[in-house]
Amino acid sequence: MGKILRRVMMIGGAITPPNIPMDWTWRQMAAEAFWNALQDAGVPVKDVDLVACNYNDRAIADSSPGPQIADALGILPKPVVPVANACAANGIASYVAWNAIASGRCDVVVSLGFARSDNYDAMEAMNSQGNYVDFDYMLGLTHINYGAMRDSLYRRKYNVSLEAAGTWAYWCNWYARRNPLAANYSKPMPLLEELCADTPEAERDRQATNRGGVASAMVFVGEDVARKYTDKPVFFDVAYAFRPPYIGNFFHYPVEGMREYDMAELPGLMAAAREAYEIAGIKKEDINLVQVHDLTAYEGMMALEALGLCELGKGQDYVLAGGMTLESRCPINTYGGGLAFGHGSAGSDFQAGVLENYWQILGKCGERQVKDARVGVNTSYGTHHSLDVVGVVQKGW
């Protein structure tokens, strides 16, 4: 690992509400989140040195988007680093932002992401392009197929109960009813018994809900300039790791740290977590709130295991023992998770967790507020866990 010249701090952020108008272009979405984040941070646009921006390349018609993004945001001639790597790409964009600041080259960087619902091709037609196309397209596999196979193996290998999955979904929905930014905020609260049922309807309710088009932005600065903008800065660190793009290679891939695992574990997330914890200077015992990117309840429990909160196969024990609640040592998914906050792909899947932990540390979360929140961790993934990202925020005052 190279030399880090200074710490990186977060001083503001914003996300668009669910169900923004379908006639908004990606330019409108991106500008909305960008300017709201700058306003939240108290940063004039002239102070921004760089924007790192991720987008869903399958959902916009524009190629070479860097100068187009800079023009839409009103920052020309300042540079934009465009990133496209599926749902967790903002983790990479934030990694770019982090490095620009930690190296001393930039003082103020905005990490921005947006996702517009596919306007040109249906999800079913485009989804295989996010996988290993040479194999998966010919086999007809999509992310949804992968998720079903992964969940089935995880359930059988570790004897995971429907009760645990239903309980996961219940608490995600409980938090979402206390988060005005969540997709399910104003919807009726489901019953635990219904979520634990062995029915197709319950299975669907244990999976992510769609958020529609979404954009979000976060403002990062160097530790030495943070006090210029706020008296409550929050430390930010991030790491990511890759796994083979073809899911057939998820079984005992012959490299260190992966050969002992199969599709029922997340070794890429384990690697990203180790690096993120090291850079942030924390141990897993220091963490007191976690937000995970969960497209299914089972995947959420797998993420807890990969982060080291519990042993492999013991995620269900943590959930059933009340580990997700505000009374636990480390509450989980207080923003509502993918199941109830909503899946936002490149527009929010990484950012939503960072923003929630940031707002929790600032004490701005109302009924879902975690007591004495100091260290928050979040996860995100892309292309069926061939990319895994971990973010860490810590109280900095």
Task: Place the predicted regions along the sequence by residue.
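Conserved active-site "lid/cap" helical segment
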Residues: 1-88, 96, 154-161, 183-184, ...
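Condensing-enzyme catalytic core mediating Claisen C-C bond formation in acyl metabolism
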Residues: 1-27, 132-133, 167, 198-267, ...
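Conserved catalytic cysteine-centered active-site region
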Residues: 2-5, 55-146, 186-209, 242, ...
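Beta-strand segments within the central parallel beta-sheet cores of soluble alpha/beta enzyme folds
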Residues: 10-11, 45-54, 79-85, 109-114, ...
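Generic structural signal for well-ordered, non-membrane alpha-helical segments
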Residues: 23-30, 34, 62, 66, ...
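Short glycine/threonine-rich loop-to-helix capping motif typified by GTGT followed
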Residues: 59-68, 246-252, 294-317, 345, ...
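Active-site-proximal alpha-helical scaffold in enzymes
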Residues: 84-115, 144-181, 217-225, 342-365
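C-terminal catalytic subdomain
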Residues: 257-318, 329-334, 351, 355, ...
